UniProtKB/Swiss-Prot annotation:
Reported cofactor(s): pyridoxal 5'-phosphate
Chain positions recorded as pyridoxal 5'-phosphate binding sites: Y72, S108, K109, Y132, N187, Y218, S246, F247, S248, R257, N292
E.C. code: 2.6.1.83
InterPro entries: Aminotransferase_I/II_large (IPR004839), DapL/ALD1 (IPR019942), PyrdxlP-dep_Trfase (IPR015424), PyrdxlP-dep_Trfase_major (IPR015421), PyrdxlP-dep_Trfase_small (IPR015422)
BP GO terms, sorted: lysine biosynthetic process via diaminopimelate, diaminopimelate-aminotransferase pathway
Keywords: Aminotransferase, Pyridoxal phosphate, Transferase
Enzyme class name: transferase
Pathway: Amino-acid biosynthesis; L-lysine biosynthesis via DAP pathway; LL-2,6-diaminopimelate from (S)-tetrahydrodipicolinate (aminotransferase route): step 1/1
Designated name of the protein: LL-diaminopimelate aminotransferase
Species the sequence originates in: Synechococcus sp. (strain WH7803)
Function: Involved in the synthesis of meso-diaminopimelate (m-DAP or DL-DAP), required for both lysine and peptidoglycan biosynthesis. Catalyzes the direct conversion of tetrahydrodipicolinate to LL-diaminopimelate.
Modified residues (N6-(pyridoxal phosphate)lysine): K249
One GO MF term: pyridoxal phosphate binding
Pfam families assigned: Aminotran_1_2
Length: 408
């Protein structure tokens, strides 16, 4: 009998969102007439921008001709998309990032997991708590942790608690670590980082030869022009950071799949013998071996995000979801709940009322208001007593959900 990867057996009962799905399915089976409103998983609801749809239609038509047909594309992404990304997302903000350092992919979730392929198993890993579960689970799957304890924390990981007490800003670790996951704007708390806060992390990473894995999937939702959108706005970050970005939330590509990862040339790790090795070369080799590239049609759609029309439509989508977040903040605050986030991110982080635990509040909203959210404890032990609501839904559903919750 074939032997399985035993690391998967260390995983807790289920990934957070499938567990939510199981509970919702059971509720719906018992209550078939209930009109559920889902403010849990961060999936967008509004249509793709017209500029992107038009570009993809043109690409589809081109694929129907001998002259315009495209087969396998470059694993790293087409040059015209990489150039557009470098120009609009990085050079426009003063970041020294070239097109060659951008690798187009089918999702930042995939990349934040796959990046472990090029990093050694012995690295000491630090994550915030609460945290996007993929960072933890992918390290468990890769054999970088021990077993989970009673609170769900895995042996071998360094957990950096974030809460209202520290402004949802993790403290620099007291012990040296090699790999640091940072996400700003933060999922799940909605917190943001200033340039000064990111500089402290960059300084730590450079002083300790650590690598920062920076998830900027929600950077488009930042409203304050003084806040950084990229780790590469910080001097020295090229020497110690990799950044993940996505078209999923700003341009609605959750169903079409397009993202990118930035690996600066010259960024180095070390081999077992101590020799310095360029990470760009390793990631390029990894992608060339294990990835066939994103569809030509989808990449043309992503390129259109950077057109004048595309930029205007993306701005409109971001504004729509941020207004949803503002409604959630306002209405739940008026209902007496303590609210965080939702000002620079599409997530609102709620302190559960009356000492209720996270899953208890989940069941309460599901059963009494027919509203689905995400229990904070699913993001880590320090998320217990909190609850996340997503602003990704129609205005009518957000208004109705708030009315139901306020009526409880």
């Amino acid at each position: 009998m074939v032997q399985v990867n035993g690391n998967y057996l260390k995983l807790k009962a289920g990934y957070l969102f499938p567990e939510i799905g199981r509970r919702v399915k059971a509720f719906s089976a018992a209550n078939p007439d209930a009109a559920l409103i889902r403010l849990g998983i961060g999936d967008v609801t509004e249509p793709l921008p017209q500029a992107c749809r038009d570009a993809m239609k043109t690409a589809i038509d081109a694929m129907g001709t001998a002259e315009g047909f495209h087969g396998y594309g470059p694993e790293q992404g087409y040059g015209w998309l990489r150039e557009a990304i470098a120009t609009h997302d990085f050079k426009a903000r003063g970041c020294d990032i070239s097109a060659e350092e951008i690798f187009v992919s089918d999702g930042s979730k995939c990349d934040s997991s796959n990046i472990l392929d090029i990093l050694g198993e012995g690295n000491r890993v630090a994550v915030t708590d609460p945290v996007y579960p993929v960072y933890v689970d992918s390290n468990v799957m890769a054999g970088r942790t021990g077993d989970a304890g009673d609170e769900g924390r895995y042996a071998g990981l360094t957990y950096l608690p974030i809460s209202a007490d520290n402004g949802f800003a993790a403290q620099i670790p007291s012990d040296p670590v090699d790999l640091i996951y940072l996400c700003f704007p933060n999922n799940p708390t909605g917190a943001v980082a200033t340039k000064e806060q990111l500089k402290a992390w960059v300084d730590y990473a450079r002083a300790n030869d650590a690598l920062i894995l920076f998830d900027a999937a929600y950077e488009a939702f930042i409203q304050d022009p003084s806040l950084p959108h990229s780790i590469f706005e910080i001097e020295g970050a090229r020497d110690c950071a990799i950044e993940f970005r996505s078209f999923s939330k700003n341009a609605g590509f959750t169903g079409t799949r397009c993202a990118f990862t930035v690996v600066p040339k010259g960024l180095k790790g070390k081999a077992a013998n101590g020799e310095a090795v360029e990470l760009w070369s390793l990631w390029n080799r990894r992608q060339s071996t294990k990835f066939n590239g994103v569809s030509y049609i989808i990449q043309r759609g992503a390129e259109a995000v950077y057109s004048e029309a595309g930029q205007a439509e993306v701005k409109g989508l971001v504004s729509f979801y941020m207004e949803n977040a503002a409604i959630i903040r306002r209405e739940l605050s008026a209902a007496g709940l303590t609210i965080y986030g939702g000002e620079h991110a599409p997530y609102v982080w709620i302190k559960t009322p009356d000492g209720m635990d996270s899953w208890g509040f989940f069941d309460h909203l599901l059963n009494k208001a027919n509203v689905v959210g995400t229990p904070g404890s699913g993001f880590g032990a320090a998320g217990e007593g909190y609850f996340r609501l997503s602003a990704f839904n129609s205005r009518a559903n957000v208004d109705e959900a708030m009315a139901r919750i306020k009526a409880l």
